């Protein structure tokens, strides 16, 4: 029953198409178009966090890798056919430019990656306008995959949840690392180079006593 609803909702979204939105959704679903956005996020984080940026960048790279590879792993485990590869739907699916993608579609890698970026970045930026904007951006990316005929709504929803979980988990791991490792290391470095409480004169006084 749930699968039937998923298919019906897919057909409703996929059939509500036009030449204009075909071009818009195809463009939104591309990867290179969003490179300026990713660069803008990194620049903002670099300005805001300065010395911590390198550590943050490492966590961002780890999160992106985990999101992408985990979605591929789930695809190969579940092996749910994309709607455009489903024999019972192939004839009615509206495909833009005839592009269907790989055989399996659960979960959507686009949705996983987009919500990973959204959740991880909004946890660092912490601005209401940004939170709303980046979540809407990720949702539109997910919607475009349904519109283009390459994913069911269920693929996108579950991919979104997976990506959001990965983004939140990596931010939590960063906070834990920053609190328990980086700050302790900074404290150790400060105390290890701190001069005696008496200052340089204390050495002279000690020498005099020995004389």
Model-assigned labels for residue ranges:
Residues 60-75, 130-144:
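Small-polar-interrupted transmembrane alpha-helices in polytopic inner-membrane proteins
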Residues 94-204, 209-211:
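Membrane-embedded catalytic cores of phosphoryl/pyrophosphoryl-handling enzymes
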Residues 41-70:
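Interfacial segments of alpha-helical transmembrane regions
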Residues 20-21, 50-55, 126-132:
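Membrane-helix interface segments
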Residues 1-37, 70-102, 191, 209:
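N-terminal transmembrane-helix/juxtamembrane module of multi-pass inner/ER membrane proteins
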Residues 15, 30-34, 47, 51, ...:
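Membrane-interface junctions
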Residues 41, 66, 70, 74, ...:
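Alpha-helical membrane-inserting segments
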Residues 37-48, 114-122:
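Hydrophobic, aromatic-rich transmembrane alpha-helices
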């Amino acid at each position: 029953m749930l699968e039937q609803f998923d298919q019906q909702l897919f057909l409703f979204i996929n059939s509500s198409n036009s030449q204009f939105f075909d071009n818009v959704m195809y463009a939104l679903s591309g990867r290179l178009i969003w490179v300026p956005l990713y660069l803008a996020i990194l620049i903002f984080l670099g300005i805001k966090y300065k010395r911590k940026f390198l550590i943050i960048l490492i966590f961002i790279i780890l999160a992106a890798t985990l999101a992408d590879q985990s979605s591929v792993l789930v695809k190969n485990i579940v092996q749910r056919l994309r709607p455009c590869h489903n024999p019972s739907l192939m004839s009615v699916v509206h495909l833009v430019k005839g592009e269907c993608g790989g055989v399996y579609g659960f979960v959507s890698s686009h949705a996983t990656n987009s919500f990973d970026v959204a959740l991880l970045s909004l946890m660092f930026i912490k601005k209401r306008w940004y939170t709303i904007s980046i979540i809407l951006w990720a949702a539109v990316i997910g919607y475009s995959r349904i519109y283009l005929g390459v994913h069911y709504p269920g693929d996108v929803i579950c991919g979104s949840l997976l990506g959001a979980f990965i983004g939140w988990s990596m931010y939590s791991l960063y906070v834990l690392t920053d609190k328990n490792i980086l700050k302790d290391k900074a404290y150790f470095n400060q105390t290890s180079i701190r001069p005696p409480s008496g200052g340089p004169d204390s050495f002279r006084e000690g020498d005099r006593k020995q004389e």
